[in-house]
């Protein structure tokens, strides 16, 4: 009986130590996020550069999908939710449709999506950058207009991906200053 109690204590202490080590690992990756963010944004911009001309040439609409109200949400108290929803929107709605424009485009859009997933994963690990619950009306509007535009919505959303990267940068800069 005495040895089983000792074994339980050892298992508990090992779990506490492992949890503390994982927390420290997560904290240390969060410490490096502000310095690695410019590199991640450069990678996103470079990956987008490979499809930018294609989608901007196909975008025949003269209005913006990613409006000032979305940027205002990124800068305001809904910044976290707006960023999270927009990443999800691009990954689940825009990019799967954008991949349907030939094998070269698919390869580059897929690469862009992987870089966006990596950014999302790093932000989620650092809860101070993505700790959100509320919905953004600006994102809902982007999604509604995107749906209304049908195929043209893909061209519009992809042609404005650089604006989205700028909004990510604005959000992250605001968060790092706090």
UniProtKB/Swiss-Prot annotation:
Gene Ontology MF term list: cytokine activity
Cystines in this chain: 30-126, 80-132
InterPro entries, A to Z: 4_helix_cytokine-like_core, IL-10, IL-10/19/20/24/26, IL-10_CS
Name of the featured protein: Interleukin-10
Keyword flag Secreted: yes
GO cellular component: extracellular space
Cell compartment(s), UniProt: Secreted
Keyword NAD: no
Sugar-modified residues: 134
GO biological process: immune response; interleukin-10-mediated signaling pathway; negative regulation of B cell proliferation; negative regulation of cytokine production involved in immune response; negative regulation of inflammatory response; negative regulation of interleukin-6 production; negative regulation of membrane protein ectodomain proteolysis; negative regulation of nitric oxide biosynthetic process
Record-linked Gene3D superfamilies: 1.20.1250.10
Subunit organization: Homodimer. Interacts with IL10RA and IL10RB.
Entry similarity comment: Belongs to the IL-10 family.
Gene name linked to the record: IL10
Predominant subcellular localization, coarse grouping: secreted
